[in-house]
Amino acid sequence: MAEQEPTAEQLAQIAAENEEDEHSVNYKPPAQKSIQEIQELDKDDESLRKYKEALLGRVAVSADPNVPNVVVTRLTLVCSTAPGPLELDLTGDLESFKKQSFVLKEGVEYRIKISFRVNREIVSGMKYIQHTYRKGVKIDKTDYMVGSYGPRAEEYEFLTPMEEAPKGMLARGSYNIKSRFTDDDRTDHLSWEWNLTIKKEWKD
């Protein structure tokens, strides 16, 4: 039996139900200080120096100005019942993702994992923002607060809370997702598009 596609009215209703108030918050982020400035502050205070070393680690700061401070490397759909890895390499050709699609079985629980590196300076208030579209209609927007991170050689990983994939005849089909990794300064560290297909089973 052919799967029933949602009508324009049904998509509009879904969008309305998922619409969140986007009131601006009266919040002013603190002035950004470099790692060097932080390390120079109260440098004669031995206890404070040890505290900052424990907090920041022995930072090997990248001096190459051509390397972005924040590099987003991978997006992974973490799902214990998936038959294989669901991963996007974000260091390659981002345009190719528009021609591919993850398959997700309806109703399964999953999380999104973002892997990234911070190379030179502390980044405050990082956020992962995701807009979901169905047939060109935006049906959902989700903001995830990632937090503040300092430079280190190892990658960081951020996991979203557990979510349940939509289910039911009207939920099955293709979704276009526009993702963005940003921060308090509204720096666009990376923006990319990818596709998700909800099916009754993992494989037809």
Curated annotation (Swiss-Prot):
Cellular compartment(s): Cytoplasm
Tissue-level expression: Brain, lung, thymus, spleen, small intestine, and kidney, and weakly in heart and liver.
Zinc as UniProt keyword: no
Cellular compartments per GO CC: cytosol; immunological synapse; membrane
Pfam families for the chain: Rho_GDI
Chief location bin: cytoplasm
N6-acetyllysine, modified sites: 43, 105, 127, 141, 178
InterPro entries to which the protein is assigned, alphabetical: Ig_E-set, Rho_GDI, RhoGDI_dom_sf
Cross-link (Glycyl lysine isopeptide (Lys-Gly) (interchain with G-Cter in SUMO2)): 138, 141
UniProt keyword annotations, A-Z: Acetylation, Cytoplasm, GTPase activation, Isopeptide bond, Phosphoprotein, Ubl conjugation
Recorded GO MF terms: GTPase activator activity; Rho GDP-dissociation inhibitor activity
Coiled coil: none
Keyword tRNA processing (UniProt): no
Protein name: Rho GDP-dissociation inhibitor 1
Source organism of this protein record: Bos taurus
